[in-house]
Amino acid sequence: TFNHNWYSEVGKYNLFNILEKCDVDHIMYTPSRSLINRSAKKSLYKIGDSCWHCHAGVGAFPLQVAVKFNIPFIIWGESIAEHYKATHYEPVPFDANYFKRVSSKLSSCEMTCEEISKRELCFFMIPSSEELEKVGVVGIHLGDYIFWDEERQVEFIKKYYGWKEDNVEGTYKKYKSVECKMIGVHDYIKFIKRGFCRATDHASADVRAGLMTREEGFDIIKEVDPERPNGLDYYLETTGMSEEEFVRVCKSLRDGKAKKLP
């Protein structure tokens, strides 16, 4: 497991509970608090959100473990095909291109700077093509083989594994990113940049699935999307940024029609 070091209490419970229920060995990498704080600030400037270390670590660390222990087969959850407008008739492979384009946005070398050394980012580096090919590592997305219905899957893991939900900043759904206490900051950045964030994403999907009406979706969006997350105070404290600097950087990243936002 890659530990983003922003675990909520419910997230910690769910992780260690499922390890007990499944009776499996477990390897976890936890980056230092100081690295997370420095990365979270640099990430905002570099890729336009606070979570480069999450994006890169969750992709790179499992691949490093696969190469080290000669594990050729990795099963991920859903691919981008589950949430974006493109239609993929073939399975979406998790490879170096997917890692850079969809997950990390920037490589560990591109994140290296005066404040962050290359050595500190060694676990955020994807193995070379030669290393992956030598082991024969293949990654698939489970959503390419079963109907990906998050609502039903959550019901299943709650019933059979005691998985817990909680209030999550930035959305009305109590299972989305419930393991992370900083997800509200990630989504609030999107709101400042684009004028909408995750409540819009989730409500749109629920309207398409027939779980709510369009009017109900708009009501939820108006209430949830603009709300300033409590996690922002922690982000500002740990990165040393002022709220004025934070908002200024987010607004500077606006593009297209979003440039007309107040």
Spans of features found by a protein language model:
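Nucleotide-activated chemistry modules centered on ATP-dependent adenylation/adenylyltransferase
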Residues: T1-P262
